[in-house]
Amino acid sequence: MTIKAILTDIEGAAGPASFLKDILLPYAREHLGAFIAAHAEDDGIEEALEEAGRLMGGFSLKPDEAEALLQRWMKQGRNPTPLKIIQGRIWQQGYEAGAFTAEIFPDVAPSLGAWKNAGIRLFTYSSSSELAQRLWLGSAGAEVFEGFFDTRVGQKLEEESYKAIAEQLALPAAEILVLSGNEDELDAAKAAGLATALIAREGGGGGNHPVAADFASVTIG
């Protein structure tokens, strides 16, 4: 069946996982307290902090309590929506201040452009917020993407999440190709009927999915 849409992960597939682990997350941890103190009443941030309180049983969080909670979530590797919203805004400030530059593999932008020109619809699916995804993909041309999915549609290891995405795209599952460096995520996508390709930038890869060394090596059926 002809591929009509590509759904790609970012971390490890379009950009190095080390950019998130070694640059973005430490920056968010370092600036979290000051950001909350300065922006707790801003549109979007106030609502995110209120939602964080609701997740903890409906408590109204003081700024230091909110910081402690979000720091704990980051240490635990959790990604609740309030945390993702605030991280995205902190990273936006970092990008704008020149604290870091988005890292994207060099094959990504040309491949995205070629797929777009071929009439293939492009989407992302990441644990990060839409803002964070747009910022990370900025150098590759985030405007080529029609949409940015995050965990509001479901967790990336769950088959139902991919079924929900296919439904939202109004496409047969088999016409959507999922690109990821995470085989467990691809297993969930495959179980939902989507086509898959493992982006194995450091080599390796099992036999459950077609393997490509980079975006330029992906075979579009």
Curated annotation (Swiss-Prot):
Catalytic activity: 5-methylsulfanyl-2,3-dioxopentyl phosphate + H2O = 1,2-dihydroxy-5-(methylsulfanyl)pent-1-en-3-one + phosphate
Assembly behavior: Monomer.
Gene Ontology annotations of biological process type: L-methionine salvage from methylthioadenosine
Name of the featured protein: Enolase-phosphatase E1
Protein family (similarity comment): Belongs to the HAD-like hydrolase superfamily. MasA/MtnC family.
Family annotation (NCBIfam families): enolase-ppase
Pfam families, alphabetized: Hydrolase
Pathway: Amino-acid biosynthesis; L-methionine biosynthesis via salvage pathway; L-methionine from S-methyl-5-thio-alpha-D-ribose 1-phosphate: step 3/6; Amino-acid biosynthesis; L-methionine biosynthesis via salvage pathway; L-methionine from S-methyl-5-thio-alpha-D-ribose 1-phosphate: step 4/6
EC number: 3.1.3.77
Cofactor: Mg(2+)
Gene: mtnC
Gene3D superfamilies: 1.10.720.60, HAD superfamily/HAD-like (3.40.50.1000)
Enzyme class: hydrolase
